[in-house]
């Protein structure tokens, strides 16, 4: 690894994104890197997954409510400074729009993407629908910026701007990891997510198949139907969907704590690439 970059862990709710993100972050720290592990998922419990602290690992979250309030405060302190009371009241009313949260979260996301220029950032994303809204905002900002700069100074500035979307499209900078379960519906949903990303010219780096019973090595006859179904989905992923595939076994206890999380990526080989 070159010492910096963004790893985005994506997928539907309930597939184990937070676990995979935490394991990747711990694995990178154990290899001597400084890492910022953060999440856009309001329901994620990244800190409880780690169950402690680790030197070199910073844990944070993009909290939509806090980011929105900070954004409103900033706009009121800058744009609202020169306004009278009536003008400030109107501006504040405008800022109560649902769009404000989208903009505020996008700005926070952009800061995280920018941070990955000099350090490792592992981003545990919100479930697919929320994440695609964030991707839409990222795309809209990119179009707005390129149009703005193409229209000024003969378009010369447009060649020099680098938007967050361009960083996500840069395979040297960003690795998108899609997490799924070895079942028909989760795999189909992950495939749809991948198509959405590809439309934005973002190519997923790898898929992680989580909670695989087959990977436990069991030969229990009661599980044969389950194993056959898993095998079919794993083949579907490997043969036509993923550039790289990593399989994690079904565990009786979820991996909690630095040791268990670090062992997860070591056993899987996910960080040896």
Positions of predicted regions on the chain:
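Generic enzyme active-site microenvironment
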Residues: 39, 122, 208
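Phosphate/Mg2+-binding loops and adjacent switch elements
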Residues: 81-184, 189-192
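Walker A/P-loop NTP-binding active-site region of P-loop NTPases
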Residues: 8-67, 125, 134-142
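A conserved catalytic-core segment of Leloir-type glycosyltransferases
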Residues: 55-85
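Switch/connector loops and helix/strand junctions flanking conserved nucleotide-binding motifs
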Residues: 45-48, 67-70, 129-134, 187-188, ...
């Amino acid at each position: 690894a070159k010492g910096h970059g963004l790893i985005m862990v994506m997928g539907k709710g309930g597939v184990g994104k937070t676990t995979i993100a935490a394991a990747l972050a711990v694995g990178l720290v154990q290899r001597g890197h400084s890492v910022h592990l953060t999440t856009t998922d309001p329901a994620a419990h990244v800190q409880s997954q780690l169950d402690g602290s680790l030197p070199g690992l910073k844990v944070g979250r993009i909290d939509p409510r806090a980011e929105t309030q900070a954004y409103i405060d900033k706009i009121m302190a800058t744009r609202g400074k020169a306004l009278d009371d009536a003008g400030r009241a109107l501006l504040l009313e405008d800022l109560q729009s649902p769009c404000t949260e989208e903009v505020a979260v996008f700005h926070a996301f952009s800061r995280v993407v920018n941070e990955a220029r000099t350090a490792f950032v592992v981003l545990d994303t919100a479930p697919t629908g929320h994440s695609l809204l964030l991707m839409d905002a990222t795309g809209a900002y990119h179009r707005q910026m390129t149009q703005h700069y193409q229209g000024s100074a003969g378009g010369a500035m447009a060649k020099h701007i680098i938007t967050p979307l361009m960083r996500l499209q840069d395979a040297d900078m960003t690795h998108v990891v899609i997490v799924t379960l070895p079942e028909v519906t989760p795999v189909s949903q992950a495939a749809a997510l991948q198509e959405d990303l590809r439309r934005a010219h973002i190519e997923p780096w790898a898929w992680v198949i989580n909670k695989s019973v087959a990977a436990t090595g069991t030969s229990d006859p009661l599980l044969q139907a389950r194993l056959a179904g898993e095998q079919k989905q794993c083949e579907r992923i490997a043969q036509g969907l993923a550039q790289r595939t990593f399989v994690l076994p079904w565990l009786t206890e979820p991996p909690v704590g630095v040791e268990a999380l670090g062992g997860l990526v070591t056993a899987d080989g996910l960080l040896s690439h």
